Curated annotation (Swiss-Prot):
Chemical reaction(s) catalysed: (1S,2R)-1-C-(indol-3-yl)glycerol 3-phosphate + L-serine = D-glyceraldehyde 3-phosphate + L-tryptophan + H2O
Cited function: The beta subunit is responsible for the synthesis of L-tryptophan from indole and L-serine.
Originating organism: Pseudothermotoga lettingae (strain ATCC BAA-301 / DSM 14385 / NBRC 107922 / TMO) (Thermotoga lettingae)
GO cellular component annotations of the record: cytoplasm
EC number(s) recorded for this UniProt protein: 4.2.1.20
Protein name: Tryptophan synthase beta chain
Oligomer and partners: Tetramer of two alpha and two beta chains.
Top enzyme class: lyase
Family as reported in the entry's similarity comment: Belongs to the TrpB family.
Cofactor(s) this protein cannot do without: pyridoxal 5'-phosphate
Gene3D superfamilies in UniProt: 3.40.50.1100
Pfam family, one: PALP
Keywords: Amino-acid biosynthesis, Aromatic amino acid biosynthesis, Lyase, Pyridoxal phosphate, Tryptophan biosynthesis
ATP-binding recorded as keyword: no
Length: 422
């Protein structure tokens, strides 16, 4: 029998959880790209509205969710928690496998959680237009949807290889009145310089970020919006983990392992960060970030200051990085093709509180196809890395005959990614 836990609408979290307040260490500050000195909040105001800058640097533990954002969350939240009983039976594992399903959102992924928040704060700050990048299109779709909800224009630079691989997502963005172009593009000086050196450049998130920031800095009524990496983005995503804690309590379950795919860190962070205090208090719980072997920021990157974009326009962040000029192979998980990682996640990996594992594309698509046939949900290529990780953990439980509780975040559906399955 299918086991699922659905919370009531009035059980949507009323606050976002800020893990920085509970960590026994401070993160290294972002540095000014010109002076290489710690950047002040005021210096970020050219690209972000002040409420989001305040959330980026605050050490307050709980940040109230504004009522207009809660009203929009209620369209799709709380999202369900399922037990993957069919997958368990197939694997013949003593592990109990659960997955939180974020594909229930209006645009099919977890990205809407922060897109709505960022659109709201920009609207009340007087912003008229948002500019952003997107890889596979989940983030761009979410921001276009949220911009339409709060009356903002949205321009999206979509990584070229994903723009070509995933046409349905650009159509979805345009449905919500978004303006989407492939990156590198002819719309910016940086894009033109990239194309001049290589007209066949497949693009990267780093390049798309540079283009978005260049446009942002040219217009005082325009702000930049980022779908991952930064503290305030992970903050908004903690609604996932906060709901998950309640749902596991309903079942009387305590997780042994929590997994999520990892690109920049937003869905993984949103899932695991609310459980970090449990780990710090001595509870045995393992957190596993699942990333591509083709873009192994956490498993093979260096821990150092680096730019968040290719042109070197962003503040320098202390993070695991493959280098700002790294151009990942053309894998289908476009949302994971980022050279860096969230400073919060990076530091937790450095401190040994989070583990990271890399998977190749063949393994994750085998896991994704199996999951779709057994559980009835076609996962996004990105989310499939978490599925592969969960299957690996379930097999370990079988090998050692240990009934472990394995939980992962299924961050989005793959109905716009079906060509990847061919």
């Amino acid at each position: 029998m299918r086991i699922r836990v659905d919370l009531k609408v009035d059980e949507i979290p009323r606050y976002w959880y800020n893990v920085l307040s509970d960590l026994p260490f401070k993160l290294d500050p972002p540095l000014d790209p010109k002076t290489k000195q710690p950047i002040s909040p005021d210096m970020l105001s050219a690209i972000f509205p002040m409420p989001l800058i305040e959330q980026e640097v605050t050490d307050k533990r709980e940040i109230p969710i504004p009522e207009p954002v809660l009203e929009e969350y209620a369209v799709f939240r709380p999202t369900p928690l399922f037990r993957a009983t069919y997958l368990e039976e197939f694997l013949q594992t003593p592990a109990r496998i659960y997955y939180k399903y974020e594909g229930a959102s209006p645009t099919g992924s977890h990205k809407t959680n922060t897109a709505l928040a960022q659109a709201y704060y920009n609207k009340i700050s007087g912003t008229e237009r948002l500019v952003t990048e997107t890889g596979a299109g989940q983030w761009g779709s979410a921001l276009c949807y949220s911009g339409a909800k709060f009356g903002l224009k949205v321009n999206v630079f979509m990584v070229k290889i994903s723009y070509e691989q995933k046409p349905m997502r650009k159509y979805l963005m345009r449905l919500f009145d978004g303006d989407v172009v492939p990156s590198p593009s002819e719309k910016t000086s940086f894009g033109k310089s990239i194309l001049a050196s290589n007209s066949e450049n497949p693009g990267s998130l780093g390049i798309a970020i540079s283009e978005a920031i260049e446009i942002t800095l040219s217009d005082s009524r325009t702000k930049y919006s980022l779908g991952s990496v930064l503290n305030h983005v992970l903050l908004h995503q903690t609604v996932i983990g906060l709901e998950l804690k309640k749902q596991l309590e309903v079942l009387g379950e305590k997780p042994d392992v929590i997994l999520g795919c990892h690109g920049g860190g937003s869905n993984f962070g949103g899932t695991v960060l609310p459980f970090i205090p449990d780990k710090l208090s001595g509870k045995e719980i393992k957190f596993v970030a699942c990333e591509p072997t083709a873009c192994p920021s956490l498993t093979r990157g260096r821990y150092d200051y680096d730019y968040g974009d290719t042109a070197g326009m962003t503040p320098l962040l202390k993070m695991y990085t493959l280098g700002k000029d790294f151009i990942p192979p053309k894998i289908h998980a476009g949302g994971l093709r980022y050279h860096g990682a969230a400073p919060i996640i990076s530091r937790l990996v450095k401190e040994g509180l989070i583990e990271a594992v890399a998977f190749d594309q063949d393994e994750i698509f085998s896991a994704a196809k199996l999951f779709a046939k057994l559980e009835g949900i076609v996962p996004a290529p990105e989310s499939s890395y978490a599925i592969a990780g969960a299957i690996r953990e379930a097999k370990k439980a079988k090998e050692h005959n240990i009934p472990r509780v394995v939980v992962f975040n299924l961050s989005g559906h793959g109905l716009f990614d079906l060509t990847a399955y061919i």
